[in-house]
Regions:
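P-loop (Walker A) phosphate-binding loop of NTP-binding proteins
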Residues: 10
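Flexible, charged surface loops at secondary-structure boundaries
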Residues: 1, 25-27, 79-84, 109-110
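N-terminal phosphate/diphosphate-binding loop that engages ATP/GTP or pyrophosphate donors
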Residues: 20, 24-65
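N-terminal export/assembly leader peptides and their processing motifs that target proteins to secretory
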Residues: 48-51, 71-79, 177-178
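Phosphate-binding/switch loop-helix module in NTP-utilizing enzymes
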Residues: 61-106
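Conserved lysine of the Walker
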Residues: 15-16
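A structural signal for short, well-ordered beta-strand segments and their strand-loop junctions
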Residues: 32-34, 88, 117
Length: 180
């Protein structure tokens, strides 16, 4: 089993669920972060530590126009990228444009720390760019991250289908090997 496992695929296909179910109570021992979708009609997204003790809103659709605070990734996100193993759920969004966060992410990816994560699929990445009116630099950063993961011999990026049992099995096997 490769030290770094990332699940990707369409929104709502069960990537985060597979990771949460595979980790169970071990999730609270992880370093890294979770991005949480909150609300029903008026959405907002928070960045949270896996144990839930630290959180901050970084994207809010509750007003007339989306409010984005990517500094949350530089201040909180970068700080959370330490631990015996990391959960990164999810990367590949606008946080790729935040320098301090990207430095911390680069260090984590270059390290021997086991990582279990979700990487935003290319289609949703393009939609995010349009919705938030991000520059072309975002698509370039997204492509650079995908290339880096694809070229790393110690990383597996698995594309999930809808509620893919193989995704959960991969996550469970990763947990058995890398989580104390």
């Amino acid at each position: 089993m490769k030290r770094k496992l990332f699940l990707t695929g369409p929104m709502g296909c069960g990537k985060s669920t597979a990771i949460a179910q595979a980790l169970g109570a071990k999730l609270e021992k992880a370093g890294g972060f979770l991005t949480r979708r909150n609300g029903r009609d008026r959405l907002y997204f928070t960045l949270e530590s896996p144990d839930g003790s630290q959180k901050a809103t970084f994207l809010d659709f509750r007003g007339d126009s989306p409010r984005v605070d990517l500094s949350v990734f530089d201040s909180l996100g970068a700080k959370l990228l330490t631990g015996d193993f990391l959960v990164l759920d999810e990367i590949g969004g606008a946080e790729l444009l935040e320098p301090a966060f990207m430095e911390a992410l680069d260090r984590a990816l270059a390290s021997d720390i086991p990582i279990l994560g979700v990487i935003k699929a290319e289609g949703p990445a393009g939609k995010l760019m349009d919705t938030l009116q991000l520059s072309e630099a975002y698509l370039e950063a997204s492509a650079r991250l995908r290339r880096r993961l694809a070229e790393d011999e110690d990383t597996l990026v698995y594309t999930c289908g809808q509620f893919d049992p193989q995704a959960r099995l991969l996550a469970e096997n990763w947990v058995k090997e890398y989580c104390p």
